[in-house]
């Protein structure tokens, strides 16, 4: 880092501290800003100046070494949300930190508090990201209060030629920390709708955590002469976060609408379906999603005008669906690149200049 950058760092931290002091502390979602690359390094700001509610700040002060894992968990959740919805009408768009006005808003804007299917997915994927990141840190030996899962040691099935060993991911600690950091007590809220939405968010947080636990897999290593695999050492490991994202996207597609008049426990909105139990890993929502086809400045919805689409696809990225029946524009993009490169002795590379034309389709 050059001298000018070093001199500018204190000013940058002070600016972020001032901006973040404007963030509402009582919300669950502002911690998600930590996953944005342009946010900077939260460890340099300190717990007091981070966009956390009072409970989260207290936990941060007691366990400051967890900040890198919290930041990585937020980054994982944001990245996977954008990946899963990159071809959808709602593409998991996040606010930017280019202005104070945007930085003071929830990262996902309207969707974070709307009580829709999109809200459900955001809470689930972010909670899952936190579990995944913290558990990875435990397994890597980066923390003193957790490590590998020791409950499986010395177990297995000798008669079948395998035993538990290695380092199983301690997902239970990751889930415990995620609950401690994210889940607000319902008793602290006022208003019937607020209580229903908070209960919904808490359920979806847990659904995200359950997804990580449910998709745990078993890896094994063979031992024996010449790779005979006479004995296997096995351990439990978390699935890739991409696989967890696919699982939660499927849950999003099959999410359950609940009644906004829930009293003691959440119920399905449709009375004829109430005999079917709600499972821990189901995603729940209260309100139907808004129209993402057209711009709605009040809700911060950009619409799909100008989005690139696939003319030949019948899926969500196809021009017919993504453009909501409005049609699309086609323009030709010229690409110039180096090609057919050859090494000439001695000592340079000679390339041809190749041009290609590509049709690009964008929604009207």
From Swiss-Prot:
Transmembrane segments: none annotated. Glycans are attached at residues 142, 188, 310. Palmitoleoylation is required for efficient binding to frizzled receptors. Depalmitoleoylation leads to Wnt signaling pathway inhibition. Disulfide bonds join 81-92, 138-146, 148-167, 220-234, 222-229, 293-324, 309-319, 323-363, 339-354, 341-351, 346-347. Keywords: Developmental protein, Disulfide bond, Extracellular matrix, Glycoprotein, Lipoprotein, Secreted, Signal, Wnt signaling pathway. GO terms for cellular component: cytoplasm; extracellular space. Its main location: secreted. It is found in: Secreted, Extracellular space, Extracellular matrix. It holds the Pfam family wnt. InterPro entries: Wnt, Wnt16, Wnt_C, Wnt_CS. GO terms for molecular function: signaling receptor binding. A lipid is attached at residue 226 (O-palmitoleoyl serine). One of its GO terms (biological process) is positive regulation of gene expression. Residues 1-29 form the signal peptide. Ligand for members of the frizzled family of seven transmembrane receptors. Probable developmental protein. May be a signaling molecule which affects the development of discrete regions of tissues. Is likely to signal over only few cell diameters. Belongs to the Wnt family. This is Protein Wnt-16.
């Amino acid at each position: 880092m050059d001298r000018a950058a070093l001199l500018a760092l204190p000013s940058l931290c002070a600016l972020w501290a001032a901006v973040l002091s404007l963030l509402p502390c009582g919300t669950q979602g502002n911690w998600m800003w930590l996953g944005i690359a342009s946010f900077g390094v939260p460890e340099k700001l300190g717990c007091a100046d981070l966009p956390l509610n009072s409970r989260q700040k207290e936990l941060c002060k007691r366990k400051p070494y967890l900040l890198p894992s919290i930041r990585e968990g937020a980054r994982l959740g944001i990245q996977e949300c954008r990946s899963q919805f990159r071809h959808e009408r709602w593409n998991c768009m996040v606010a930017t930190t280019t202005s104070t006005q945007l930085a003071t808003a929830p990262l996902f804007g309207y969707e974070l508090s709307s009580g829709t299917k999109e809200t459900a997915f955001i809470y689930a994927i972010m909670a899952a990201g936190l579990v995944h990141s913290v558990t990875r840190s435990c397994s890597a030996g980066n923390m003193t209060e957790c490590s590998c899962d020791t409950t499986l040691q010395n177990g297995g099935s000798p008669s079948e030629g395998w035993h538990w060993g290695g380092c199983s991911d301690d997902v239970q600690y990751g889930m415990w920390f995620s609950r401690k950091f994210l889940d607000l007590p319902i008793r602290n809220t006022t208003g019937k709708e607020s209580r229903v939405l908070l209960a919904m968010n808490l359920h979806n947080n847990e659904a995200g955590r359950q997804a990580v636990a449910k998709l745990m897999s078993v890896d094994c290593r063979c031992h024996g002469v010449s790779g005979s695999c006479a004995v296997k050492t096995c351990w439990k490991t978390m699935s890739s976060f991409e696989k967890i994202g696919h699982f939660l996207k499927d849950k999003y597609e099959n999410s359950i609408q609940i009644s906004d008049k829930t009293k003691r426990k959440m119920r399905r909105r449709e009375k004829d379906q109430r005999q079917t139990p709600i499972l821990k890993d189901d995603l729940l929502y209260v309100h139907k999603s808004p129209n993402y086809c057209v711009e709605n400045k009040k809700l911060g919805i950009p619409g799909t005008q100008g989005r690139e689409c696939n003319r030949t696809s019948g899926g969500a990225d196809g021009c017919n669906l993504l453009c909501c029946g409005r049609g699309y524009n086609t323009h030709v993009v010229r690409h110039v690149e180096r090609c057919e490169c050859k090494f000439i002795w001695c000592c340079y590379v000679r390339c041809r200049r190749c041009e290609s034309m590509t049709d690009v389709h964008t929604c009207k």
